[in-house]
Amino acid sequence: MGIGRAYKAPSLYQTNPNYILYSKGQGCYASITGTGCYMMGNEDLKAETSINKEIGLEFKRDGWLAGVTWFRNDYRNKIEAGYAPISQTGTSKVKTDIYQWENVPKAVVEGLEGTLNVPVSETVNWTNNITYMLQSKNKETGDRLSIIPEYTLNSTLSWQIYQDVSVQSTFTWYGKQEPKKYNYKGQPVTGSEKNEVSPYSILGLSATWDVTKYVSLTGGVDNVFDKRHWRAGNAQTTGGDTGYMYGAGAETYNESGRTWYMSVNTQF
């Protein structure tokens, strides 16, 4: 059981009103011009604070380990880009909105973590951990803070064949990933912006040889079954009169295919 309070000061560029960043659109929550926006520092920004709580239960005996932990982080004054423009640039034919960094009054991240370690034999050990997200949202808008898996399971099976040789298999299972509910204009996402990533898993194999007490060699393969996931684009649709780049929802990253590797580790 534990409780703590965290503090995060805004960066220099976020508090300097003379420092301006330009975004092509993804940083503009509700831009009506479709031409991108400027982000201006805000000297009145407050520091982010959070109250972090966790409660856990653990069982340990003869190499066995089982545990579950509930955690919740409540944020106040979380720093994000503003939701509405405070001004526009100059008198040119195409005007550009200007936003400021602002404090989001309240946000919350809450979930469960589980652990299970099993001593299968004197030479084989099986370790597991899982994280399950209950919520991760901006309390002002009700939207998700980021695109993350509903759950992530990591499982490792290790076999110490000889004193100087071991092999290992790793298994990672990612849960469903959902996009944000609203686009950067503050409107509900539609079409391809609602794309989700279905659950998928990755398997890896490796072996390590301790050549001497100072040098070891490791070789292996990640993503044994060559599971591929392709990035389809940015999360949300952007553009204007000259054309659009349609959003891809949660399909915003690549999952590398099968990869072989070898490494040399030394210690002194």
Task: Indicate where each model-derived feature is located.
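Short glycine/proline- and charge-enriched loop/turn segments
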Residues: 20-22, 36, 95, 184-189, ...
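Outer-membrane beta-barrel translocator domains and adjoining extracellular loop/strand segments
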Residues: 12-18, 25-28, 78-85, 133, ...
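Gram-negative outer-membrane beta-barrel transporters
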Residues: 65-75, 83-183, 263-267
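A short beta-strand motif that forms part of the nucleic acid-binding face
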Residues: 3-5, 16, 72, 132, ...
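C-terminal beta-signal and adjacent terminal beta-strands/loops
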Residues: 7-8, 76, 81, 173-185, ...
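Outer-membrane beta-barrel signature, preferentially recognizing the C-terminal barrel domain
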Residues: 5-67, 72-74, 92-112, 117-119, ...
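Extracytoplasmic gating/loop element in the C-terminal half of outer-membrane beta-barrel translocons
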Residues: 194-195, 243
